From Swiss-Prot:
The RuvA-RuvB-RuvC complex processes Holliday junction (HJ) DNA during genetic recombination and DNA repair, while the RuvA-RuvB complex plays an important role in the rescue of blocked DNA replication forks via replication fork reversal (RFR). RuvA specifically binds to HJ cruciform DNA, conferring on it an open structure. The RuvB hexamer acts as an ATP-dependent pump, pulling dsDNA into and through the RuvAB complex. HJ branch migration allows RuvC to scan DNA until it finds its consensus sequence, where it cleaves and resolves the cruciform DNA. SMART domains: HhH1 (SM00278). This is Holliday junction branch migration complex subunit RuvA. It comes from Gemmatimonas aurantiaca (strain DSM 14586 / JCM 11422 / NBRC 100505 / T-27). The gene is ruvA. SUPFAM superfamilies: DNA helicase RuvA subunit, C-terminal domain (SSF46929), Nucleic acid-binding proteins (SSF50249), RuvA domain 2-like (SSF47781). GO terms for molecular function: ATP binding; four-way junction DNA binding; four-way junction helicase activity. It holds the Pfam family RuvA_C.
């Protein structure tokens, strides 16, 4: 089992990255959008936690920034009708901790934000995983715990057209810079960061 790959980024795309290891072997890892956004530039060193899927016709290596994110991916594979491509799509649309919270809270609507996940599929994922998701362990420390205030702000940004990943990231940055008193000020702060890009 290949559980981790460390090396130099040779090439990267939205859904994959090619890494040349010190031994001279290059690995192509399929990645969620959140990993692509956090990758250093080509020529820089990166370490990814990986999961290998072996099929009769191909071997695919999936790469993640944290072991926790990989654990959520692996747990998603235990849901009926969820293969590696859909599990990767879920982690491209939602952060790992948001996936875990959605499962704990049986939040069908959050899972339905993911392309190719309708109500029936979301309900099936929750049915299969809601009682098992604790096995992935705690999320890595980020300095800021999720809050109802932050969740409301993220929902507001998504309603304005931003995706889950960028909304989560902007809201977390505002919270870390100083706790806002209400949702509207948090949304305004997040919007100023998003529009400044």
């Amino acid at each position: 089992m290949i559980s981790q790959v460390r090396g130099t980024i040779m090439h990267r795309e939205l859904d994959r990255v090619e890494i040349m290891t010190a031994s001279g072997v290059a690995y192509e890892c399929l990645i969620p959008l959140s990993v692509f956004e956090s990758l250093p530039s080509e020529g820089q060193t990166v370490t990814l936690h990986t999961h290998l899927v072996v099929r009769e016709d191909a071997w695919h290596l999936y790469g993640f920034a944290h072991a926790y994110e990989r654990a959520v991916f692996q747990k998603l594979l235990h849901a009926k009708g969820v293969g590696p491509a859909l599990a990767l799509g879920i982690l491209s649309a939602l952060t790992p901790d948001r996936v875990v919270r959605a499962l704990h809270e049986k939040d069908v609507l959050t899972l339905m934000r993911v392309p190719r996940v309708g109500r029936k599929k979301a309900e099936q994922i929750i049915l299969d995983l809601a009682d098992k998701i604790d096995a992935v362990g705690p999320a890595p420390a980020t300095g800021t715990a999720p809050s109802p205030l932050g969740d409301d702000a993220v929902r507001a940004l998504i309603a304005l057209g931003y995706n889950q990943t960028e909304a989560d990231r902007a809201v977390r940055a505002v919270v870390e810079s100083g706790a806002p008193k209400d949702v509207s000020s948090l949304v305004r702060g997040a919007l100023s960061r998003l529009t400044a890009k």
